[in-house]
């Protein structure tokens, strides 16, 4: 018996399996880790540009595995498809080419995402129904807002490597977002990244305690001066 090949997708359309996803325990461990700390631990070279939170409550954070979508600017057909494929805890990350002329997601899609128990949405493009997004519950990061709606014609691809507001995002990457922006990390880097992040958080906690103490004890401020001067001397400065 001859096997029947699966029907081919038209050019520009594709839906792929996501493949590797982060260990749920690792995802949970990253909740509450600031994006600034993760960015520093990744060499200060990764992070979104031009995205801002639109979910109202700046204390609301995003943490989950990426389900990536690439769309034609101004078209959201494949985002609708992605919503039907998403699992609880996923983050839909959309490469909309940074176009802000037409909204790619609105209030109805927000409700669909909430029903799917998504961890959040990141859109390199516009959203609309801003008041509804600002109610919170679902973290959303986007490049802008537009009242003009999208088309639903395609093409588009799901679970492919994408570029999103300066980020290189692959399906299954860990996505973190907070008031400072969005960062991503590949699943295989998470164990060592988590260790580094915890060490940095411990260092910062120590520094915070020192600064608080120095408000009441001026003698402690000399430590800060010496630390800065040591950095300058290492660069040849005569201090």
Where in this protein do the model-derived segments appear?
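C-terminal binding/interaction regions
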Residues: 175
């Amino acid at each position: 018996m001859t096997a029947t090949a699966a029907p081919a997708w038209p050019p520009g359309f594709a839906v792929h399996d996501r493949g590797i996803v982060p260990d749920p325990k690792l995802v949970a461990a990253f909740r509450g880790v600031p994006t600034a700390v993760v960015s520093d631990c990744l060499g200060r070279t990764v992070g979104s540009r031009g995205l801002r939170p639109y979910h109202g409550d700046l204390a609301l954070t995003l943490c989950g595995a990426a389900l990536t979508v690439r769309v034609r600017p101004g078209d959201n057909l494949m985002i609708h498809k992605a919503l039907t494929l998403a699992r609880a805890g996923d983050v839909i990350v959309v490469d909309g080419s940074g176009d802000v002329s037409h909204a790619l997601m609105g209030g109805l899609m927000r409700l669909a995402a909430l029903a799917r128990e998504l961890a959040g949405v990141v859109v390199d493009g516009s959203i609309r129904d801003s008041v509804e997004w600002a109610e919170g519950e679902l973290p959303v990061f986007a490049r802008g807002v537009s009242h003009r709606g999208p088309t639903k014609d395609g093409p588009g691809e799901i679970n492919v490597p994408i570029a999103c507001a300066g980020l290189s995002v692959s399906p299954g990457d860990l996505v973190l977002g907070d008031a400072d922006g969005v960062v991503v990390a590949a699943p295989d880097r998470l164990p060592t990244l988590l260790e580094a992040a915890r060490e940095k958080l411990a260092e910062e906690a120590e520094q915070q305690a020192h600064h608080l103490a120095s408000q009441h004890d001026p003698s402690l401020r000399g430590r800060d001066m010496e630390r800065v001067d040591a950095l300058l001397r290492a660069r040849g400065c005569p201090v």
